[in-house]
């Protein structure tokens, strides 16, 4: 019902050295023991670099990849298409295309349409960087559309297959219930459940984000609050302070989650 995505931005993937990245992937695949699907986050390198990384990930047991365009090459649309075409031809596992605001490398709908001819491009992680949120769902019968913007309910209504979230690995019953409600078309209940957690958590993100950047800061706070700390952020990104952690524990407790005592 869920996928373990390793070394994407929330997992500090862009900050990992190559040997760390593949040690992490190897450990995750071994720990999963064929009980979960493992997807690795890759990006930013040129075509040759990405293909080398993708082949290694495939050999280590990843069943798919999340891949962003080579943003530092400032590629044009035809070059983005060629990048994914070359990658698709070089591997035998699935690729989820991903681009977000802030990368300054948008992918336009016509380029997504042309990707339909690429055998191993199987999913699009969608946050409507350009155009309207609904646009991508014209391709819902071609690709697995994965929401990347708190739009799980709308995604399901429009034919999407899943959503990115910050919480399924923190307290799985919450997001599994959200998606179950969506599949049963109990959309109002699903949205209310999402909002009951995302609303309070967004306030924590806002408070922490005013002091330090980085996508992993609150994520690491969440794991620590639930009794599974996974280490500090990588510099120069900071960590949650005690006041922020107290607020986070209060929020999670208010959501009814089993937060262990901090004493």
Q: Locations of the language-model features?
A:
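Catalytic alpha/beta core domains of metabolic enzymes, predominantly
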Residues: 101-204, 208
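Structural recognition of alpha->loop->beta junctions
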Residues: 58-64, 90-93, 114-123, 230-231
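C-terminal alpha-helical cap/extension of soluble enzyme domains
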Residues: 1, 171-263
């Amino acid at each position: 019902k869920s996928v373990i995505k390793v070394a994407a931005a929330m997992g500090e993937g862009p900050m990992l050295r190559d040997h760390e990245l593949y040690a992490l992937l190897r450990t995750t695949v071994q720990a999963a023991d064929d009980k979960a699907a493992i997807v690795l986050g890759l990006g930013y390198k040129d075509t040759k670099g990405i293909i080398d990384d993708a082949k290694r990930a495939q050999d280590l047991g990843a069943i798919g990849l999340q891949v962003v365009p080579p943003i530092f090459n400032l590629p044009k649309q035809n070059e983005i298409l060629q990048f994914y075409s070359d990658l698709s031809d070089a591997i035998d596992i699935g690729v989820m295309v991903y681009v977000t605001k802030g990368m300054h490398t948008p992918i336009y709908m016509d380029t997504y349409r042309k990707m339909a001819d690429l055998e191993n491009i199987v999913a699009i992680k969608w946050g409507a960087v350009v155009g309207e949120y609904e646009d991508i769902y014209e391709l819902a019968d071609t690709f697995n559309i994965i929401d990347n913007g708190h739009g799980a309910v709308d995604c399901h209504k429009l034919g999407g297959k899943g959503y990115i979230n910050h919480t399924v690995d923190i307290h799985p019953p919450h997001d599994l219930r959200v998606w179950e409600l969506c599949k049963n078309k109990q959309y109002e209940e699903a949205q209310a459940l999402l909002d009951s957690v995302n609303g309070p958590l967004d306030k924590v993100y806002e408070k922490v984000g005013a002091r330090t950047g980085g996508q992993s800061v609150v994520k690491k706070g969440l794991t620590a609050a639930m009794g599974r700390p996974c280490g500090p952020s990588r510099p120069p990104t900071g960590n949650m302070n005690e006041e922020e952690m107290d607020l986070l524990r209060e929020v999670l407790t208010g959501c009814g989650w089993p937060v262990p005592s901090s004493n």
